[in-house]
Design a protein with these regions (language model features):
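Active-site loop segments of alpha/beta catalytic cores
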Residues: 2-4, 22-183
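A contiguous, low-structure linker/loop signature
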Residues: 1-19
């Protein structure tokens, strides 16, 4: 793969790699996405079109970073998974706040801007929850999603129809205002 592609394999091949992950505002992918968001907002704002933006939940980001190995990590090294989820939760909040700053930039914000996200609202994809038992979601997903919701005020959840067994756990989350289940 060339230098202009995003990763296609898990970044954390080794657990020790977690310590090298940084939230770097100068990261080229972070800068490119913020630039693209800024461009979109500037060009759609005059038409009052909302820019919807959802984010990985901490559990989904942890899976993207670790891959399928996270499922054995649940059993073999839950302490590592919690460290990874703590990083993923901080990364989700950091990234979503940066995106909200672009979406709600002075001069471009309008009443429809906060369709899915904003300074006080966040939408999270909980796709990986459908591959977890309710008890695993309760331990590894919910506490970190709750911290993200608490950081923003209101939360929305997106999940897939393969995961209705986890919906009762979603309903226990404080500040959740919407659950979107898609096929």
């Amino acid at each position: 793969f060339g230098e202009d592609t995003s990763w296609v394999k898990p970044v954390l091949q080794e657990k020790s790699d977690l310590d090298s992950l940084l939230l770097d505002p100068n990261n080229k992918w972070f800068a490119r996405l913020n630039s693209a968001t800024r461009y979109m907002v500037q060009h759609i704002a005059p038409y009052r079109i909302p820019l919807g933006r959802g984010y990985y939940s901490p559990l989904d980001l942890a899976w993207a970073l670790r891959g399928e190995a996270i499922y054995t990590d649940f059993y073999e090294d839950p302490e590592f998974v919690h460290r990874l989820l703590e990083f993923s939760m901080k990364a989700t909040i950091w990234f979503a706040r940066a995106q909200a700053a672009e979406i709600f930039a002075p001069g471009f914000v309008h009443e429809l801007s906060a369709w899915h996200c904003g300074p006080n609202r966040i939408a999270l994809g909980e796709d990986i929850s459908s591959l977890c038992s309710p008890s695993h979601y309760r331990e590894f997903g919910a506490p970190y999603t709750q911290q993200v919701f608490d950081a923003f005020g209101i939360g929305e959840i997106h999940c897939h129809s393969a995961g209705p067994h986890v919906v009762p756990e979603f309903l226990k989350l404080k500040r959740a205002r919407q659950i979107q289940i898609v096929a």
